[in-house]
Amino acid sequence: MAKRRGLALDGVLLLDKPVGLSSNHALQRAKRTVDAAKAGHTGTLDPFATGLLVCCMGRATKISGRMLEADKTYQAMLQFGEETDSGDLTGHIVARAPDGFAGVEEAALRDVLSRFVGTIEQIPPMYSALKRDGKPLYEYARAGIELDRPPRQVTIRHIELLSFSGMQAQIDVACSKGTYIRTLAQDIGRALGCHAHLAALRRTHVGPFSLDRAVTLEALQAMPDAKQALLAMNELPAGLLPAT
């Protein structure tokens, strides 16, 4: 059977990735829906996370490198009282708050959040795609092996507290490439002395692109002509495409 090739489409699809799908699975579904021959995305979202996945079709894949380097913005829900091995709600609990913990004081939280704004050091999580000896760290983690990881510098542009209930807090975080929001949640919990993990994560911006213009897979598949959802090459923000 001949391999399905698709159309030579050029443009960018702003996809609102659903929970439960890997970024690549979401990309492949979108690629099939618009019938594109060539597609790639510009930065992985964990399966439990939702939000903006910038899918580049055809010649638009030339912007992928710049988008990987771009700042991102996320809305994250922090759950206080428990730390997990993965840093999110999918992992196993590895630490708990002291007995009698009844929630975080808002003033203490605001103080701790302010300490993480600027250039900070993060130790990448074991549950990540970073490689050691050609093997992703998450494969070692799944085998119960913990490796030393050197800290890396990242920049947190801002953290805004959106909502707070004592046991949970929703924050808006703008950050540089390579920032792990799971690690940020873990480090915030440790600084508060109560532990924390991510209960939810939603990406809202990648460089100049916003979730406001994104389409869900369901909406894309319901369109009479899904190709109309693509941003054409001449609609892309100035300066994204490399000079020819």
Swiss-Prot record:
> What's a single GO BP term from this record?
mRNA pseudouridine synthesis
Q: Which residues form the active site?
A: D46
Hey, which family's this protein in?
Belongs to the pseudouridine synthase TruB family. Type 1 subfamily.
Q: Name one Pfam family in it.
A: TruB_N
Q: What class of enzyme is it?
A: isomerase
Provide the gene name from the record. Answer: truB
Q: What InterPro entries does the entry give?
A: PsdUridine_synth_cat_dom_sf (IPR020103), PsdUridine_synth_N (IPR002501), tRNA_psdUridine_synth_TruB (IPR014780), TruB_C (IPR032819)
Q: Say if the entry is tagged with keyword Kinase.
A: no
Stored SUPFAM superfamilies: Pseudouridine synthase
E.C. code:
5.4.99.25
Free-text function comment from the UniProt entry: Responsible for synthesis of pseudouridine from uracil-55 in the psi GC loop of transfer RNAs.
Offer an example of a GO molecular function term for this protein: tRNA pseudouridine(55) synthase activity
Q: Which reaction does it catalyse?
A: uridine(55) in tRNA = pseudouridine(55) in tRNA
Q: Which domain of life is it from?
A: Bacteria
Keywords from UniProt, A to Z, are: Isomerase, tRNA processing
The protein here is known as: tRNA pseudouridine synthase B
